[in-house]
C-alpha cells in the first residue's frame, strides 16, 4: 500500500436542521461519515484534518440542502497493480474465493486454482500446493475492480511459497 498527503476541499451536504450552533461538529461528522475509510476512485482517505486556519467558502443551496466545500489535509492510501499483499484465505464456495487483507479484498479467479472439499472444509489447490480455508497466504495484485464501501477490491493470484 502506498500513501500521500494533500490539501483539498471535500464537498459535504448538510440538511437544514444541521445548520445550528453545532455547525462545526456537524460539518466534521459529515466529512468523516462521507470520506473517512471509504474507497473513492481508487484511493481511500485514511486520515482527515479539517483546516481551521482557512475560511470556509460560502455554501450552495441544492435541492433544499446546503453543499459546503470543507478545506482539509487528507492522507490517502492506495494500492498498485503488482503490489504483494498478505492476508487470510476465505473460501465460501467453489466460485467465491477471496483473500481478506484489512481494507483490501482480493478476488481469485477460477483459473487461479481449484477448490475442493475434504475433511469437512474447503481447500484451494494451486501448482501442487494446498491452502486451507482461513490460512495466511501471499498474493500479487493483478487488476483493480470496483471497490465496495470501505474496501479496495482487486483480482489477484496467490504467490506460491
Swiss-Prot record:
Subcellular location: Virion
Reaction equation(s) it catalyzes: RNA(n) + a ribonucleoside 5'-triphosphate = RNA(n+1) + diphosphate
EC primary class: transferase
Cellular-component GO terms for this entry: DNA-directed RNA polymerase complex; virion component
GO terms for biological process, alphabetical: viral transcription
GO molecular function ontology, one term from the record: DNA-directed RNA polymerase activity
Family matches, as InterPro entries: DNA-dir_RNA_pol_18kDa_poxviral (IPR004973)
Induction section of the entry: Expressed in the early phase of the viral replicative cycle.
Role description: Part of the DNA-dependent RNA polymerase which catalyzes the transcription of viral DNA into RNA using the four ribonucleoside triphosphates as substrates. Responsible for the transcription of early, intermediate and late genes. DNA-dependent RNA polymerase associates with the early transcription factor (ETF), itself composed of OPG118 and OPG133, thereby allowing the early genes transcription. Late transcription, and probably also intermediate transcription, require newly synthesized RNA polymerase.
Entry protein name: DNA-directed RNA polymerase 18 kDa subunit
Lineage per the UniProt record: Viruses, Varidnaviria, Bamfordvirae, Nucleocytoviricota, Pokkesviricetes
